[in-house]
């Protein structure tokens, strides 16, 4: 079964749901489909989920041309809260998720990668928590999930600099669980997913939940703190100055307020 939609295609085979972000001309920026995610995580016939990107990249985060735009009656808090609720819900589902990561995984795209149970990465991957470059911070679990994988110091480095992490270093640091050449990433992810899908679904889901309970509560509490921090940053003069500087192609002049 294959279902193609503008933001995400979905395919089902051998008990595996394969969700593909489908905006390759923009490195999949802003791509996604909540209904596809809901189906994959709830449908009883789905035993394991793969999330990947069409084209050269996994997902390059929010479309930066739309930053700061939203429904006129929506508060900054509610704007971030919608994304936070979606992330928390995805973390609480019992089905295993594998991220097959090629090319760019930036900002929210990187956070989607981090929320998976396993990450198969490519040697050409470029990972980045880019939010600080826009005067804001990760708001869907980036600081929390990355810390569980690579520790506080390296997470602070990525959060505070916005620098890129290449695929080899991501594997060495523990962001990627498997490292493949770009042409082999999807096949490796499917191999793992088929193996999991062939196991007892009750045992698989319970096993995932047993491991998750060791740290997931702390991560979710941290994600809620990200929500408060981000909605506060949206109100600062420095955030507005950063956006203006990007538009005007100049260095920002921050006032620390």
Describe the predicted segments one by one:
Residues 34, 38-45, 64-102, 149:
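An acidic, glycine-rich surface segment that forms the CoA-thioester-binding/catalytic face
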Residues 56-60, 106-107:
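Short, active-site-adjacent cap segments at secondary-structure transitions
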Residues 208-217:
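Short, charged, surface-exposed hinge/linker loops at domain edges
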Residues 89-202, 228, 235-236, 241-244, ...:
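Crotonase-fold acyl-CoA enzyme core
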Residues 39-43, 196, 233:
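Hydrophobic helix-cap positions at the C-terminus of alpha-helices
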Residues 1-54:
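Conserved CoA-thioester-binding segment of acyl-CoA-metabolizing enzymes
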Residues 19, 23, 33, 51, ...:
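Terminal peptide-recognition signature
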């Amino acid at each position: 079964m294959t279902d193609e939609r503008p933001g995400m295609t979905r395919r089902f085979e051998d008990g595996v749901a394969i969700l593909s972000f489908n905006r390759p001309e923009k490195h999949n920026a802003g791509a996604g489909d909540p209904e596809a995610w809901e189906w994959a995580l709830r449908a009883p016939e789905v035993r394991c989920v793969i999330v990947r990107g069409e084209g050269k990249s996994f997902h390059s985060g929010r479309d930066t041309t739309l930053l700061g735009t939203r429904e006129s009656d929506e508060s900054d808090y509610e704007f971030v809260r919608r994304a936070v609720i979606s992330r928390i819900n995805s973390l609480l589902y019992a089905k295993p998720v594998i991220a097959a990561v090629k090319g760019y995984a930036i900002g929210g795209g990187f956070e989607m990668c981090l929320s998976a149970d396993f990450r198969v990465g490519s040697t050409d991957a470029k990972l980045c928590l880019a939010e600080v470059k826009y005067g804001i911070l990760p708001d869907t679990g980036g600081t929390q999930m990355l810390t569980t994988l690579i520790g506080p110091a390296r997470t602070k480095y990525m959060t505070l600099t916005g620098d890129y992490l290449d695929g080899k270093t991501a594997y060495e640091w523990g962001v990627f669980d498997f490292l493949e050449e770009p042409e082999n990433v999807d096949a490796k992810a499917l191999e793992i997913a088929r193996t999991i899908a062939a196991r007892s679904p009750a045992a698989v889901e319970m096993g995932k939940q047993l491991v998750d309970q060791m740290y997931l509560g702390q991560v979710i509490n941290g994600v809620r703190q990200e929500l408060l921090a981000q909605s506060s940053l949206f109100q600062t003069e420095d955030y507005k100055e950063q956006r203006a500087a990007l538009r005007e192609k100049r260095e920002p002049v921050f006032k620390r307020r």
